[in-house]
Swiss-Prot record:
The gene is dma1. Belongs to the tryptophan dimethylallyltransferase family. The keyword Metal-binding does not apply. L-tryptophan binds at T65, V66. Its EC number is 2.5.1.-. Induction: Barely expressed under any of the conditions tested. It comes from the Eukaryota. The keyword Transferase applies. Substrate binds at R86, R251, K253, Y255, Y339. GO terms for molecular function: transferase activity, transferring alkyl or aryl (other than methyl) groups. Tryptophan dimethylallyltransferase; part of the hps1-dma1 gene cluster that probably mediates the biosynthesis a derivative of cyclopiazonic acid (CPA). The hybrid polyketide synthase-nonribosomal peptide synthetase (PKS-NRPS) nps1 might incorporates acetyl-CoA, malonyl-CoA, and tryptophan (Trp) and utilizes a C-terminal redox-incompetent reductase domain to make and release the tryptophan tetramic acid, cyclo-acetoacetyl-L-tryptophan (c-AATrp), as the first intermediate in the pathway. This is Tryptophan dimethylallyltransferase dma1. It holds the Pfam family Trp_DMAT. Pathway: Secondary metabolite biosynthesis.
Amino acid sequence: MVEIQSQNEHHKFWANHLLPQFRRYIAEIGAYTSKQQDEHVKFFDSLLPHLGPRLPHPHTKAVLTVANMPLGFSVNLSDARKPIARMEIEPLDDTSGSAEDLFAANCIPACFTTLVKGMTTRVDTRWAHQLRQAFTPTSEESAIAKPRLRPGIERVSLAYFGITFDGDNRAMKYCTSHWPKFLGTATAESNDATSADAFLFSAIRRLKPGGEALAPSLDAIQHYFQNERHAKLPSPILFVGLDCIDPSRARIKMYGRTHSTAFSNVRNIMTLGGRALTAETTEFLARLRSIWHLLLNDPKAKDDEDYDRPPLDPNSLRTGLLVSFEVSALVSTPDIKVYVPFWQYHETDVQAINNLEQIFSLLGWDWGSGKYGDLLRKTFVGTDLAATQNHDYVSFNYSKRQGSYMTMYHVPPRPESTTA
């Protein structure tokens, strides 16, 4: 086991809380050798300075997770391969959210540098840096954008990073939002959802090299948005993520939110209003339909495709479903996924575990026999899972190549004390 040397009180604060949890998490997943675990833990430790000062932050809250933690874990299960651990991080520093750095832009370059240095696969950041340059507002634009944010939103993050741990390998994804730049530059007449989407799509089409190859999928999404004018539409797009690999292979995901959980609405979105219905999509929808009531924790959703499950917290901005539209130069139609905010439909981790283990058993995975519950119990030691909710989102997908695959996103409990 490697020994981690904390660099300062803030690093020590995060290390004491998160390092043991991350080590247990990747160990319990069961897909990594001891050497691989040690290497990933050392890399994880190198990221902790980018989480910002010890809690409470003097100026802002992390917006990556519903619990305002700047970091999350996730596990991906699949028919086709071993489980894969992932993590997501929102970089912050001690001035993030202050008057001098309203949208926490100043800390992003340093985090980029640490991440690129820690990857074991080839990294290509050309597209990422182009979007960062396009969407980072000036201080003047930030001052204009801040009061234009939707009521209840304190800050929109300009950067999330996702890291995948696949055996020895680590690969990274960059996420950003166009909203601060858009709100800081839009006129009163053009400050609307349609204009915001157009601003984003235009920036993606201009990416070099290869942005023009994304046109067929982008056209299909924009056509859907323009022809499906209803309140359930997952528009406007909220943020965008992309793989930091060669642009000829990179995926770009655009995330929006629909406030309806009715499966009829999911079908409409997944098929772009019926325009993108294929044999693969039909199989995907059939599999998703068979477990939808378990994802929503409501038997009413089993037989009624129009049933819209009420959220546990209707006042939250994170209601309904998160939807991603994935485009790449390799395909001419977008790949669409839905993400269920489990904390909105499961009061506790125990409820979530019970439903997910039923799903895993239906899918023929050995994670349905108590293994998944053990992952959380052994990771979050001392946490009463019958009284907590450490689940964030859960996604399900299907493809001919990978079969069924799911990702469960987890939020580490917030430190109970701000002492190191």
